[in-house]
Amino acid sequence: MKIYGIYMDRPLSQEENERFMSFISPEKREKCRRFYHKEDAHRTLLGDVLVRSVISRQYQLDKSDIRFSTQEYGKPCIPDLPDAHFNISHSGRWVICAFDSQPIGIDIEKTKPISLEIAKRFFSKTEYSDLLAKDKDEQTDYFYHLWSMKESFIKQEGKGLSLPLDSFSVRLHQDGQVSIELPDSHSPCYIKTYEVDPGYKMAVCAAHPDFPEDITMVSYEELL
């Protein structure tokens, strides 16, 4: 398993944008052009090119030759490389991607003030109770820990919104370990959280517990 991250410390230059756009599919180029906010376009573009960059090095392929598709519930995949599993997430200034030989999910969230009503509506009873038990000044952080962990699990499953958020429970313990409460019939999975930046929460979900200790940072220049 490998996890890569791009920190968008500056906007893409026109030259970088044009070069990256040349790597991606016509459909993705059109999607990027339709974004109202340039930052949204850049996040989407960088996520696509990051995957292409990693896959091209691993399999000796040209970036522009990699063909993406989607699975039944919309999870991106590479049909020609069925063992190359990946997942992308972006929020704020971060674009991150996880790679593994088995299905994997990743999520990053920029924290902001929350309403506990959202937690009551979407979280399991156990998770909501855990959240309420936190001190007031810890509740926002724990909310985003829960949200990113749950999103990473849903993305690892690859079933999208067909899997209700309250159908399973996650808990982040004081020692940093994560426990998951799943139906007995469900195959084992594991979650690890990462502290990449103050004001962000990130989690990865995989079919095995062999997580890297850190993420590998990638610069714009390394993608060219």
Curated annotation (Swiss-Prot):
GO molecular function: holo-[acyl-carrier-protein] synthase activity; magnesium ion binding
Name of the molecule in the record: 4'-phosphopantetheinyl transferase Sfp
Effect of D107E: 3000-fold reduction in activity, but no change in substrate affinity
Matching Pfam families: AASDHPPT_N, ACPS
Annotated catalysed reactions: apo-[ACP] + CoA = holo-[ACP] + adenosine 3',5'-bisphosphate + H(+)
First-tier enzyme category under EC: transferase
NCBIfam families: pantethn_trn
Disulfide bonds: none
Role this protein plays: Activates the seven peptidyl carrier protein (PCP) domains of the first three subunits (SrfAA, SrfAB and SrfAC) of surfactin synthetase by transferring the 4'-phosphopantetheinyl moiety of coenzyme A (CoA) to a serine residue. Required for cells of B.subtilis to become producers of the lipopeptide antibiotics surfactin and plipastatin B1.
Cofactor(s) needed by this chain: Mg(2+)
pH dependence statement: Optimum pH is 6.0. Displays less than 20% of Vmax at both pH 5.0 and pH 7.0.
Effect after changing G105A: Almost no activity
Residues reported to bind Mg(2+): D107, E109, E151
Chain residue ranges for the region called Peptidyl carrier protein binding: 158-189
Reported effect, S22T: In strain: oKB105
Phenotype when changing W147F: 5-fold reduction in activity, but no change in substrate affinity
UniProt-reported outcome of changing E151A: Loss of activity
Any one GO BP annotation for this protein: antibiotic biosynthetic process
EC number: 2.7.8.7
Keyword Transferase: yes
